[in-house]
């Protein structure tokens, strides 16, 4: 039997996910296959070492939908235990997606760093502008106080002159 015809696909259930953590993977296999063929197929397709294979036939079950009755199809299931240190990546699309996610995350962090740098520069410029404005306001206040003092002195001088001329 051809290696590609032996394994129909993985069986992904809650129980199979729990078994994956201990190195046991479940596959739907051809009804005509046996343990040794399944072992060779898994080792060839996934490039791993298999410790042991359990195979059993899942019987058909009666299902009802409304008034009609039917049966699920029976199939052969293989539980494949891998040697320690080997794993099978059943979701090949995840790893490139994870890389894309990490790239976008790094790009986002770079963008955030640039934005933070620009914010810091703008805050520094705003601080400089605020200091310049404060200096100008202080200078204007000095000039106004000087002009007020000069005007007061002029008024005092005028009043003194008027008093002196009146005497």
Curated annotation (Swiss-Prot):
UniProt region (Unknown), positions on chain: 131-167
The keyword RNA-binding appears for this protein: yes
Biased composition (Polar residues): 158-167
Gene Ontology BP terms: translation
Basic and acidic residues bias (residue ranges): 97-112, 137-157
Region spans: Disordered: 91-112, 137-167
UniProt keyword terms in alphabetical order: Ribonucleoprotein, Ribosomal protein, RNA-binding, rRNA-binding
Function: One of the early assembly proteins it binds 23S rRNA. One of the proteins that surrounds the polypeptide exit tunnel on the outside of the ribosome. Forms the main docking site for trigger factor binding to the ribosome.
Subunit structure: Part of the 50S ribosomal subunit. Contacts protein L29, and trigger factor when it is bound to the ribosome.
Name of the featured protein: Large ribosomal subunit protein uL23
Organism annotation: Mesomycoplasma hyopneumoniae (strain 7448)
């Amino acid at each position: 039997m051809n290696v590609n015809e032996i394994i129909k696909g993985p069986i992904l259930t809650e129980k199979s996910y729990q078994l994956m953590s201990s190195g046991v993977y479940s596959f739907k296999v051809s009804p005509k296959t046996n343990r040794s063929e399944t072992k060779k197929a898994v080792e060839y397709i996934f490039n791993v070492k298999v410790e042991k294979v359990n195979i059993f036939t899942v019987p058909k079950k009666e299902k009802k939908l409304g008034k009609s009755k039917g049966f699920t199809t029976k199939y052969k299931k293989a539980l494949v235990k891998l040697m320690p240190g080997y794993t099978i990546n059943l979701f090949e699309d995840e790893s490139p997606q994870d890389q894309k996610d990490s790239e976008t995350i790094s790009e986002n962090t770079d963008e955030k760093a640039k934005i933070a740098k620009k914010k810091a520069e703008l805050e520094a410029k705003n601080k400089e502008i605020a200091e310049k404005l404060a200096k100008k306001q202080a200078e204007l206040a000095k000039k106004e106080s000087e002009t007020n003092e000069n005007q007061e002195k002029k008024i005092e001088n005028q009043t003194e002159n008027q008093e002196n001329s009146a005497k």
